[in-house]
Regions:
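Catalytic/RNA-binding core of pseudouridine synthases
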Residues: 1-240
Length: 240
């Protein structure tokens, strides 16, 4: 065990602190304050909000190969070096930020490159479920590119690139993108509908996917109110 090994090293006057590990090249020494400062700087740089996270890492190829060969040779079933690196980083991040590590579905993924000493944060999508009613004809469900210029912009579409000035997708997604500081929105409606039909009753279900949202905690009731207000204004304007 560890205690017996320490005693033997002491009797033989061997200082293990001065010995480089032939398997991992002391890679765990890189999990230091400098690394966690880089992570913190990246979080602050992006201004990203999260409650759950996952850690992924890149370690030198030769270390990975030695670890694999050792496990294969002695039929070891212990955790790999890379998994141990991820576990230790995740534990430290939990201590620092009081956020939970989540393996199935997480807000962000910390990708730690121990080869080039770089940190990258992958921001996972935010999904918002809802229903909508359409009380006026002539509004498409999704953004409709101009049929003449194919979305590039021309005189026919007043250089908007759109066949119709508004869509259900745009009315909803623009507000959410602004609040989440997301990169892009994708509208997933439950089925398609013709532009000249109404959507009454309990509404049509949809899921709005926000890619790379910096903020995740938004007031959905306020979003609903803002979307309705803008839609009413657009309807009133178009009817005048």
């Amino acid at each position: 065990n560890i205690e017996r090994a320490d005693k033997v090293c002491e009797e033989l006057d061997i200082n293990l602190d001065d010995v480089d590990c032939v398997i991992c090249d002391n890679i765990f020494d890189k999990l230091n304050d400098d690394l966690y400062k880089k992570i913190d700087d990246k979080i602050n740089q992006l201004g990203v909000e999260f409650d759950t996270f996952l850690v992924g890492s890149k370690i030198p190829k030769d270390i990975q190969e030695r670890d694999d060969k050792l496990s294969a040779k002695f039929n070891l079933t212990v955790e790999t070096l890379k998994k141990e690196v991820n576990r230790l980083i995740g534990l430290r991040l939990w201590e620092i930020y009081d956020k939970e590590a989540e393996f199935e579905s997480q807000d962000i993924v910390f990708n730690i490159d121990l080869v080039e000493s770089k940190v990258r944060i992958q921001i996972n999508p935010l999904y918002i479920e809802g229903k909508y009613n359409k009380l006026q004809r002539g509004i498409p469900q999704t953004k409709w590119p101009c049929t003449k210029c194919k979305g590039r912009g021309c005189e026919e579409c007043n250089f908007t690139g759109k066949q119709y000035p508004e869509s259900v997708e745009e009315l909803i997604s623009e507000h959410v993108l602004k609040l989440t500081k997301g990169k892009e929105a994708k509208f997933h409606g439950a089925g398609r509908e013709d532009i000249d039909v109404l959507m009454l009753g309990s509404g049509r279900p949809f899921v709005l996917e926000i890619k790379e949202p910096r903020l995740r905690k938004i007031d959905l009731a306020q979003v609903e109110e803002d979307v309705i207000d803008e839609a009413v204004d657009d309807i009133m304007e178009s009817s005048n």
